From Swiss-Prot:
Chain sites annotated for binding Mg(2+): D495, D497, D499
Cofactor(s) in the UniProt record: Mg(2+); Zn(2+)
Subunit comment: The RNAP catalytic core consists of 2 alpha, 1 beta, 1 beta' and 1 omega subunit. When a sigma factor is associated with the core the holoenzyme is formed, which can initiate transcription.
Protein name as it appears in the record: DNA-directed RNA polymerase subunit beta'
Amino acid sequence: MNELMNIFGQPQGPQSFDQIRISIASPERIRSWSFGEIKKPETINYRTFKPERDGLFCARIFGPIKDYECLCGKYKRMKYRGIICEKCGVEVTLSKVRRERMGHIELASPVAHIWFLKSLPSRIGLLLDMTLKDLERILYFENYVVIEPGLTDLKLHELLSEDQLLDKQDKFGEDAFTAKIGAEAMKDLLANLDLIEEKATCREELKETASEAKRKKLVKRLKLIEAFLGPSQEVEDVAAYERFEGYKERIERPDARPLFKIFPDATRPEWMILEVVPVIPPELRPLVPLDGGRFATSDLNDLYRRVINRNNRLKRLIELKAPDIIVRNEKRMLQEAVDALFDNGRRGRVITGANKRPLKSISDMLKGKQGRFRQNLLGKRVDYSGRSVIVVGPELKLHQCGLPKKMALELFKPFIYAKLELYGLASTIKAAKRMVEKERPEVWDILEEVIREHPVMLNRAPTLHRLGIQAFEPTLIEGKAIQLHPLVCTAFNADFDGDQMAVHVPLSLEAQLEARVLMMSTNNILSPASGRPIIVPSQDIVLGLYYITMELPGMVGEGMAFGTIGEIEHALASKAVSLHAKIQCRYKTVDDEGNPITVRVTTTPGRMLLSEILPRHKAIKFDLINRLLTKKEIGNIIDVVYRHCGQKETVIFADRLMKLGFSNAFKAGISFGKDDMVIPAEKEILIREAQDRVKEYEQQYLDGLITQGEKYNKVVDVWSETTEKVASAMMKVIEQPKPGFGVNSVYMMAHSGARGSAAQIKQLAGMRGLMAKPSGEIIETPIISNFKEGLTVLEYFNSTHGARKGLADTALKTANSGYLTRRLVDVAQDAIIVENDCGTTRGITMKAVIDGGEIVVPLGERILGRTVSVDIIHPLTGEMLVAAGDMITEREVEVIERAGIDSVHIRSVLTCETRDGVCAQCYGRDLARGTRVNMGEAVGVIAAQSIGEPGTQLTMRTFHIGGAAQRGAEQSFIEATLDAKVMVKNRNLVMNSEGVPVVMGRNCELALLDEQGRERARHRVPYGAKLNKALAADGAMIKKGDRLAEWDPYTLPILTEREGIANYVDLVEGVSVREVVDEATGISSKVVTDWRQQPRGADLRPRITLRDETGEVVKLPNGLEARYYMSVDAILSVENGARVRAGDVLARIPRESSKTRDITGGLPRVAELFEARRPKDFAIISDIDGRVEFGKDYKTKRRIVVRNDETGEEKEYLIPKGKHISVQEGDYVQKGDLLMDGNPVPHDILAVMGVESLANYLINEIQDVYRLQGVKINDKHIEVIVRQMLQKVEITDPGDTTLLAGEQVDRTEFEEENRLVQQRMNEGEQDLRFAIAKPVLQGITKASLQTRSFISAASFQETTRVLTEAAVQGKVDNLEGLKENVIVGRLIPAGTGSVVNRLKQIAAERDKALQLADGVDETPALADGGEAAA
């Protein structure tokens, strides 16, 4: 055995390392990697196909081509291992060394590395403080640069042309100064830089400069210089200081003993200029013979050949002392060749190969989806896997899948071989192999045994969330298709129309264990996105269950009574009773103590059959199933069963439900027939009414009472309303069972939630309604026919618009949604649960989500499964309901809701103070398990998947009314939802001429209070709304269903507050106002036009003032004069000099909805929010509380001043003149209120209102988009992503830290610096100041590129830029996140991997403690193996 060991060498264990460092390689280091210099551009000999000596594939340099055999064949076999053949110079060893041995090319003239020159910001340019343009002129031999000005009047780094140089040499003499050209010049410039001095001057300038731009530039430069210098060490030994080669500085100390600072890890700037080019191993750029004598080669060989050719030519020219101009040209060509090798196409023309295809350079090998990172390191292919079509397996249990025998035999081969040997059926592996290939009968028995309880993993692409891969126990089946359990289809998003799935076999015991414990389908009952069950029956099963729980009057056997379920089955079999008859029966259950009892229930035989499979538990009452079950109800039942009876019962229950559903759906014999779609008789009448109303609006338009836009809006409204009416009439007809026919089957399918929806039936049997144009506007003429009647040619043509758009959208959507998921995963991948409790007292306040007065999401749903941060006290009795630090479960939610609490303070990931991760308390419940979240759970990835997975269901764009076509009319009134007392908040009312109160304020709200005085609803009322007369007095009581307020949704009115005589000011005909004569009607109206475009209109401020009889301007209640400014497009409603009453309309501004401005909706809106972009029409928000005043306008902007009376502080805002301003002079605005229409900018919200408001805004906006599609996502997922977006802070005051003002650093780094200051204060230093910083919001792309791990960032986007920056800074990657560990091939630090990680950490800390105890402090230096170099 020892002999063998000696021959083969000890087996090498996998190299283990803790970090990876990347830095710029010095020429010496490149030479030290190399096994020889490559001198010739030849690759292989065309006759012998052996590599040429000293060429790109040279065997002497890179190693032998065949294992243990030199090139000339003198030495063969193992026994000559390690000998170098004296004839051909090749070492006898394994041929795989050709994958790791590198070579090099010695350049005749230095060249600049394109990454450091061109990757913006140019590193060389920053260091030398020169522009990229100047650098290129030096580099490509256009200008000389002064390197050493001597005593002349030239400046350092000054550029000179050839002629200028000669002039200066004549003037000062040739030796008076030094000027050079090309990369040598640049090398000298970099070598002469004294980084330590530069650093000092930069810091000085920073203190003195006032200009922001200059400061930014200096900070950038300073950071770069510090990155080059690296960390410093202090030495006191003079001799060591003298010996040290690199950067060093003396520090004078008051006690006269100098202290020396050396920078041992400093990177020399001149290394950015290459003297030696490394050549990568030949097996990584192979040359492969194809049949037919041709060769396929990697593009790199071409690029290297170019470099070698030009380099050799340059050497020859220099030896021949050729004229300067020729040598220069050759040097320039060499520079271009090296540029192309590193990054083809970055500078100048792209170098193309023989087939006009650009050559792939080293940078291209790393970049993009096909690059090294994403193709090979993050996306490896897997052995022991197969794929096949799936078919439905309704007789399987939930934890099983059907695996074709042929596939199983192939997948489990190694296990079968082992077993065959174990039982002595085969003497060797070879014999076993033969048996398996012949498919002998005993092989099948062994296969059965091997497969027993060995889970396999099934995956369906696209794997959008973690439920796309689940483990099942295989059962062997005949045939070639995989059988899948119907209930897991929702999770896989699978159907059986030809979908394929992949099977993977977990090999090791640990893998099998994880598959069984964590990934088994029975463990994934709840969805990780919302915590609702995902194993929910759908389609046929729902239909079957709906059918057996129906109760119909007048069926056979109605009113009978039964004692047991057996009797019912008997009666059903003998047709004595119908499934749907109303009967009485005994039901055995358990009472609250858990004792068995019998209750008498009124129900149907079908429901009794269902009750048989219901688990018996005190919390599961018979009422749960004693009703008509729709898909939603069934989901609720499964949820209740899971919460009370646990997982095992739920799985058994779900399986039984499925069996029951399928068998009854088939017995029901429900079919889909043309006559099931009934067209309502009222349809004709409704359509005729609508057409009459449309004619009336046309007439009003012709008479000039309404504008074109208003007519359009009204017509669209009428038609949407009519479509709804026809649809509801149709539903009424379909709902009623027809005598002798039973219930309408199409209605049953839709109502149960099995297939189809009311909207689809509406198109089949109602009317199709309005269609959208491609631009998103709605076509005024609706489609009156339905599909049953058939469309006319014109109608069909109109409907193709919308349909085609839908198809185009779907194609775009999938790609966009996938990209959003990728960005989310990348930003959140390192959010992992790393500790149990971070001990923070902070949190956020949760309220119910209320929209338009209705509670959309109740408080209970939002706080379920979160941790309370402040004790919850009952508002009336004062008893403690939930203590701080407890988790809110279903029980607590009930208690809180009963107490009528409307807001709860909870812990949140946003305020979690854990470093490098999140704590379990702040996260709360793991939604997929229903218990507190486990340590090591990768909550970031789960959040990203939960948000990204429904992305494909979101639309690409919702049209303002493309949505409204379905949404019915715009909201134009508020009705009371309950009997209540109404309080008017922020009252600002005026009685108009009819005595109706009109709202004059922008933030008027109606609060509805119940008997106890608790607020139950709150409605925002727009400016200009007419209120119910009863509301003139505060505290009026109103009845449910009363109209509280109404308004015109299509125009914004400008109202008067006093009576008086209207007087036009600056409304000049032809400049700021024009008569618009409607061609169709001949009626004219006055419209305010854009007066700023006119030369005469620059100083105008069109307005209407109110005067009294004497001609004085009327004063308003707040003491200001009554002036009303007009905005562009306002239509004047009063004539000059007309008398007006308070509350009358002076002008109307049409709302933009005729040409709907696309509200960015759907996916793009979600992406816009996560990327923290400025919305297209963003609104300006107020920074302070105060009153609004209008200042003097600028040319294109209006000035709004907000002044706070208490503090006297004021802020002014400039708003473009065309935009509609939503506040009026004298209005009181609060901090964070919008001053104009549009969406606010997230960064502004953060700056003005803080983190919690920002988070609330983002959560609500994102949830709105998902809610519209009916997708439930838990808030905490969005919080996790927002936390990742807020990782950085910007230093506003550096205090006494080493940070710089204005730089952005990680929050942890900032806290660390302040901790150091605190430490110094504890040690007794006086008057130190902490650094102060403000949070910075970054979009998800930017945040993922700024992670601490450069490997993770490089594998995401902009690979070259990330690597350049990392190399310059000499970054160290500590391999903390998931991605980095996948890339270097280790266990990820999440899930079970986090436990291993933790153990390693503990061991390392223990070793350190032991070392300290021994008094030895060995901090091992970085292993050379861990260093990469650019």
